[in-house]
């Protein structure tokens, strides 16, 4: 994705808009930090998918909206009602069930929401446009990533050694599939409350969960199922509370207009 972003932006944006963030070190640091976080997030996800941990990624992204909500309340002082507290408690209970049973924290299921929620919080503080922000997230990390890829290829254990050329080309350009939703997320992170972003976060883990069970046939044991159910209860409480809160705001707004 970095190659695509870094190629498209200079063609579609005036140079003054591209270099403007360089004048603000704080903003530049925010964007580079966001790039590091999302890279770590993606790397964890890719490792998990390739090591039979798809259900853990689904679990992590179910928890992620609650982390986003918590950061929204702590950092941006967004209202933190009782339904949000209950939802986070249920999510914590789900993680605790896995901890007690497996005698270790579900690392993937915690790394993904923590890194992505922090990424969302940083993006909300970025002043640059969504695409320019993505450009700086990628441009400073590209040399490191390219050096790593070259090292793996020269060592004989890179993608070229494992797949044919057509698949390798698809891998190189698959970043475009990621660029579009991430650009849209960047727009949403700047213009929507983190609570709203959190609710929309349910779609991805649901699709991932279904793929893990129905397509890749990962083992869903009783303990993991119970953990999912506990977290789903928390999400139901959270969603219901958000809907009622939204309706209340609309009702008050309507009365004020009258």
PLM ranges: what are they?
Residues 47, 64-83, 206-225:
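C-terminal transmembrane-helix exit sites in multi-pass transporters
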Residues 58-63, 130-140, 179-214:
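Helix-helix packing/entry segments at the starts of transmembrane helices
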Residues 83-99, 112, 223-242:
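Hydrophobic transmembrane alpha-helices of multi-pass small-molecule transport proteins
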Residues 17-20, 49-53, 93-96, 100, ...:
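Membrane-interface helix termini and inter-helical loops of multi-pass transporters
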Residues 15-40, 44, 107-111, 159-180, ...:
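Loop-to-transmembrane-helix transition segments
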């Amino acid at each position: 994705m970095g190659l695509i972003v870094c190629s498209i932006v200079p063609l579609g944006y005036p140079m003054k808009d591209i270099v403007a963030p360089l004048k603000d070190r704080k903003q530049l640091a925010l964007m580079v930090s966001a790039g590091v976080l999302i890279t770590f997030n993606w790397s964890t996800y890719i490792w998990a998918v390739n090591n039979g941990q798809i259900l853990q990624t689904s679990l992590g992204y179910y928890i992620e909206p609650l982390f986003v909500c918590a950061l929204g309340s702590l950092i941006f002082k967004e209202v933190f009602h009782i339904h949000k507290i209950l939802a986070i408690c249920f999510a914590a209970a789900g993680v605790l069930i896995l901890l007690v049973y497996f005698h270790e924290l579900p690392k993937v299921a915690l790394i993904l929401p923590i890194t992505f929620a922090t990424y969302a919080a940083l993006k909300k503080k970025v002043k640059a446009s969504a695409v320019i922000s993505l450009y700086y997230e990628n441009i400073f990390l590209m040399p490191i990533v390219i050096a790593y890829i070259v090292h793996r290829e020269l060592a004989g254990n890179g993608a070229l050694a494992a797949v044919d050329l057509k698949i390798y080309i698809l891998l190189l350009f698959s970043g475009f599939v990621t660029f579009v939703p991430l650009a849209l997320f960047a727009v949403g992170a700047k213009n929507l409350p983190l609570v709203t972003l959190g609710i929309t976060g349910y779609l991805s883990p649901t699709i991932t969960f279904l793929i893990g069970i129905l397509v890749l046939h990962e083992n869903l044991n009783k303990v993991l199922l119970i953990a999912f159910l506990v977290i789903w209860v928390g999400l139901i409480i959270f969603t219901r509370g958000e809907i009622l809160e939204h309706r209340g705001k609309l009702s008050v707004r309507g009365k004020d207009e009258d």
